[in-house]
Each structure stands twice: as C-alpha cells, then as structure tokens.
Swiss-Prot record:
It comes from Escherichia coli O17:K52:H18 (strain UMN026 / ExPEC). Homodimer. Keywords: Amino-acid biosynthesis, Aminotransferase, Histidine biosynthesis, Pyridoxal phosphate, Transferase. Pathway: Amino-acid biosynthesis; L-histidine biosynthesis; L-histidine from 5-phospho-alpha-D-ribose 1-diphosphate: step 7/9. PANTHER family: HISTIDINOL-PHOSPHATE AMINOTRANSFERASE, HISTIDINOL-PHOSPHATE AMINOTRANSFERASE-RELATED. Its cofactor is pyridoxal 5'-phosphate. GO terms for molecular function: histidinol-phosphate transaminase activity; pyridoxal phosphate binding. The modification N6-(pyridoxal phosphate)lysine is found at K214. This is Histidinol-phosphate aminotransferase. It is an enzyme of class 2 (transferase).
Length: 356
C-alpha cells in the first residue's frame, strides 16, 4: 500500500512552484543592506488610533482620500492593499481563469508577476525586452491571444530605466478590449513626471501599481495601491480580503500621505537622487566595474568583471547586494540599492580593493 504524503495532497502547480526569493529569504549577516531597495533609515511615527478592539475599515477612508489627492485621481479609482504585491495577485484573480487565460510580462523584470500567476494556476508568457530593455512590440503582438493581464514595470526593476511612453500607448491600443495593462510604478516617486496616472480616463483597461515601501520609507508597513477606473476597482473589491489593512498600518499610511508627509517624502527622494549620482560617478572609476547603467530609481545596476566573486567578497564583508546573474540578459550584473553616504563609501572602498 502506497503512503500518501502531505506534499502529495498539495496542488501540482504548488508542488512545482519555485517561491520568490525575496531579499530577506536570501538572508545574509550584513550590516550594509543594499539588496532590497529600501530607504536606509527609519522614519518615526506615533500611533493615533487606539481602537484595536474593533475590525478596521476594508478601505480606510483617510488613506484612500489622501492617496487619491496625492496621485491626482478620484477616490473611486484607488484600492489599498497589503503592498503592491497583493495588487499583482488581485488582478490575476479577478481577470484570469486558471487553465485558460495567461499573463504576459517582459524579462528581465520583477519576479512576483510569474509567482502570483503560477500559484493560481494561470499560464505565464514572456516576451524578452530588446537590447535597450524597451518593449518588443512585435513580439508582444504575436503573443497576445488568450492574454488577460499584461505587466510592465516602469521604471523597471532591476534595470532602472523607464519604458518609452509611446511604446506604452501602442501596447494600450494593442490590448484595448482584450486585456488589462498593469503599469508597475513602485519607483515612480523618483521620476514622477513619467507616471501614467493621467492616462486612466483615456484607457479604461489601464491599472497602475504603487507602494509606500520605497520613497515613503515604509517597506515594513506592507501598504500598496492599485489605481484604475472604477469598474476595475469594483471587480478587485470582490476578491480582496475583508480587512486587508490593520488599524496601525492604516493609521501610519494616512500620516505618511498627509501634506507634511508628502513634503518629507520628496526631501528623501532628492537626497537619494543626489546620493545615486555620487555612487554612479564613483562606480564608473572602479576597475572591476565594466558598465554602470542609467537609473531613474533608488538603485543602480552595474556589470562587473567576475561578478560572482565580487558579490561573495562584499557579502563576506557584510555588504549585501542583489545578484542579477540569473536574469535574462543580465549576466555579470549586480544591483546596488542607494543607501547613506557612509554605506556608499563602504561599497566604493570594498570594490576598489577587489583584485579582478
């Protein structure tokens, strides 16, 4: 008699799933953490809501209204969730039939699009980007049949560049009446002029993902947003959990999105951009660095000689970067989060000492 294990009882696609390797899952014992695109120092908040005996609102009014005002959209066009990652999954759950529909994305890019789809049992299709990391529109057109959700990260993680807005428009026309196009704007605060939020009235099938994890310095809060037309938001409300945000999270998010909170965020962005340019200039002068790519974000992608050895050497010194070698077209590349000046100097000094 054969013995059935607990794993045997699991869904086949879950048994075969490779989970997303987050920075925290990968571990490390560093004191310079530059692998998760977090803000380098903590921002202090005081809790003002003391009603922890009551369930929170599903969509806290103050958070929704503050974010709508900040993003320049109507409150009815905003959904708040447990990070933008939940927004990624909600869109698949609302629009894709497992075993029938597909999502489409463009590697090298963020890994959670595929993980979310595979968890639900939805097919993943990819069209690798062109050599300049822009969209291959012909390749996309050839693969759209049966696709319900298209993910485009702009600025793209991990490459750091914006997607050409004209290409976005062509994509939105190709998919009109066929699929939802999701612009992942997790890093848009570092290049706000490039946001597509103003396009929502023109394209009813456009959705935009946002987060408080990066420029707002609240990665530990797990608070993200989906901006879309009311019809899309109403569908997402059918599949979201009844209480996605805890009371403390909603409390802090509302404070972060107050007028003074927005001013503080923009000051942080200016500081990170200045530090980014300092680090880029220094990296370009280091012998083990082959190429430094332009960035519109709070991280830098660079190609190294003997990148695996460099990565391990810095790891052993307590400087934790993100290895991108396994991503398509990113052989030899490491991603470096922009931290404090002290952290930048640690990276620069360690790289200058590398003998490769």
């Amino acid at each position: 008699m054969s013995t059935v294990t607990i794993t045997d009882l699991a869904r086949e696609n879950v048994r075969n799933l490779t989970p997303y390797q987050s920075a925290r899952r990968l571990g490390g014992n560093g004191d310079v953490w530059l692998n998760a695109n977090e803000y380098p120092t903590a921002v202090e908040f005081q809790l003002t809501q003391q009603t922890l005996n009551r369930y929170p609102e599903c969509q806290p009014k103050a958070v929704i209204e503050n974010y709508a005002q900040y993003a320049g959209v109507k409150p009815e066009q905003v959904l708040v969730s447990r990070g933008a990652d939940e927004g990624i999954e909600l869109l698949i759950r609302a629009f894709c039939e497992p075993g029938k529909d597909a999502i489409l994305y463009y590697p090298p890019t963020y890994g959670m699009y595929s993980v979310s789809a595979e968890t639900i049992g939805v097919e993943c299709r990819t069209v690798p980007t062109l050599d300049n990391w822009q969209l291959d529109l012909q390749g996309i057109s050839d693969k759209l049949d049966g696709v319900k959700v298209v993910y485009v990260c702009s600025p793209n993680n991990p490459t750091g560049q914006l997607i050409n807005p004209q290409d976005f428009r062509i994509l939105l026309e190709l998919t009109r009446g066929k699929a939802i196009v999701v612009a992942d704007e997790a890093y848009i605060e570092f290049c706000p002029q490039a946001s597509l939020a103003g396009w929502l009235t023109e394209y009813p099938h456009l959705a935009i993902l946002r987060t408080l994890s990066k420029a707002f310095a609240l990665a530990g809060l797990r608070c993200g947003f989906t901006l879309a037309n009311e019809e899309v938001i109403n569908l997402l409300m059918k599949v979201i959990a009844p209480y996605p945000l805890s009371t403390p999270v909603a409390d802090i998010a509302a404070q972060a999105l107050s007028p003074q909170g927005i001013v503080a965020m923009r000051e942080r962005v200016a500081q990170i951009i200045a530090e980014r340019e300092y680090l880029i200039a220094a990296l370009k002068e280091i012998s083990c660095v082959e190429q430094v790519f332009d960035s519109e974000t709070n991280y830098i992608l660079a190609r190294f000689k003997a990148s695996s050895a460099v990565f391990k050497s810095l790891w052993d010194q307590g400087i934790i970067l993100r290895d991108q070698n396994k991503q398509p077209s990113l052989s030899g590349c490491l991603r470096i989060t922009v931290g404090t000046r002290e952290e930048s100097q640690r990276v620069i000094d360690a790289l200058r000492a590398e003998q490769v």
